[in-house]
A protein has these predicted regions:
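Extracellular low-complexity, O-glycosylation-prone stalks/linkers
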Residues: 1-2, 6-17
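Conserved beta-strand positions that form and line the central face of beta-propeller blades
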Residues: 9, 28-30
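Cysteine-dependent hydrolase recognition
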Residues: 16-17, 30-32, 36-394
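Short beta-strand segments within Ig-like beta-sandwich modules, predominantly Fibronectin type-III
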Residues: 19-25
Length: 394
């Protein structure tokens, strides 16, 4: 068979049996066995020639679609803890109060905890665990606002730069795991160019390079520390973010429902760019996914989602953009995926990923290919936190 469909409901842990096998000339298939009001996720597997390297095993292309008919709106999403840098408890009191209202109106039961930027990560996590135990909701989310202590873990170099970037990387997933053991006993590495990535026993950075359990809490961070390429202060950047976040939630920031992909690694066997193509096609339809230049296009035309990848440094991706550009640009995209070397380690000063959301428009950015992300559920009402948790646990 050239193409096979499997199906699962949202809370299912495994795929069901293949529903149908189609030949290479088929362009559509209708599932007649569904119920209205239920969302179904479909995985499409396409048979491809064997890989040119390795053992020549069977090769598949895979894509996902989340679909349903007359899906009811979600009125109760769960509980959300906003973990806030105590520095801004008073100066951003209005914006924080408004954020809590926005979360409430979006179906969350919001709560807050204030922490000091110099607290130990395990101290912060203990507060999160106490909250989680008191709120045994089906869905729980963390919104990290400000300079919340950054956990580091592993001896990794997912950008491939083993000679100068292998070591501990930022790991907010630590805050999202309720179960599982995090150790600080075995990894010993000081080879990276930055001492931030050093990891030695007993230094407070963890050994784990994989999550020791499922990530149970949805997680997002808004952190503008050490972003001095911007003329605005950290407090001003946080206020601007909360202002545009509110504007988006109440419908004052309108974007065309389409996706842009600018892939400067088109010949990569890894398929860099696939997180853009696969997600955007599932969300908007392939006719609404455009292969265009990132900065030049988004400065003039709006795309709800965008993807850009190119040779990277801590503050840029070649032929995409840079943190310096983000200080003045108002690119017309709310959600963006960016991929390149170094900046996936987002705790660099003036980091490119954080530069995107520090800009005047963008609300969310992710390192777009390692791992591949799954955002298709957002087109049917799920949150970006859900997609993040799903991706972390995949």
């Amino acid at each position: 068979p050239e193409r096979a469909y499997t199906r699962a409901q949202l809370l299912d842990q495994v795929w069901g049996d293949s529903l149908v096998y189609l030949n290479s000339k088929s362009t559509s298939w209708t599932d007649t066995s569904i119920q209205q009001g239920i969302g179904y996720e479909y995985q499409v597997l396409k048979s491809l020639p064997a890989f040119p390297t390795g053992e020549g095993g069977q090769n598949f292309g895979a894509g996902n679609i989340y679909s349903g008919i007359k899906i009811p709106p979600t009125h109760h999403r769960g509980a959300c803890l906003v973990v806030i840098d105590r520095t801004y408890k008073n100066t951003l009191a209005f914006e924080i109060s408004r954020l809590l209202d926005d979360l409430l109106y979006d179906g969350w039961i919001p709560d807050t905890v204030f922490v000091d930027k110099n607290d130990a990560a395990d101290q912060v996590k203990n507060g999160i665990l106490d909250w989680a135990k008191k709120n045994p909701d089906t869905h729980q989310a963390l919104f990290l606002l400000g300079r919340i202590p950054v956990p580091y873990s592993g001896e990794i170099a997912p950008d491939g730069h083993n000679s100068d970037h292998r070591g501990a990387w930022p790991c907010d997933g630590y805050y999202g795991t309720i179960d599982g053991l995090w150790t600080d006993q075995t990894v010993k590495t000081t080879a990276a160019a930055s001492s931030r990535n050093d990891n030695i026993p007993g230094d407070g950075k963890f050994d784990n390079k994989f999550f020791p359990s499922k990530v149970q809490l949805q997680i997002g961070r808004v952190d503008f520390s050490n972003m001095n390429k911007f003329s605005e202060s950290e407090e001003q950047l946080l206020r601007r973010y909360l202002d545009k976040n509110h504007a988006w939630r109440i419908g004052k920031m309108q974007m065309m429902e389409q996706g842009l992909v600018d892939n400067n690694f088109p010949s990569s066997e890894e398929g860099l760019g696939q997180s853009g193509w696969k997600n955007f096609a599932a969300m908007f339809g392939i006719s609404n996914v455009k292969d265009l230049q990132y900065r030049q296009t988004l400065s003039k035309q709006s795309f709800l989602w965008s993807y850009g990848c190119g040779g990277g440094g801590p503050e840029s991706a070649s032929d995409i953009s840079s943190t310096t550009n983000f200080t003045t640009d108002s690119l017309l995209s709310i959600f963006t995926m960016l991929f390149g070397s170094y900046f996936g380690d987002w705790d660099y000063p003036n980091n490119f990923l954080r530069g995107a959301i520090a800009s005047k428009t963008c609300l969310a950015s992710t390192w777009g290919n390692r791992p591949n992300w799954f955002f298709q559920h957002m087109a049917l009402g799920e949150t970006i936190g859900y997609s993040t948790q799903l991706t972390m646990n995949n």
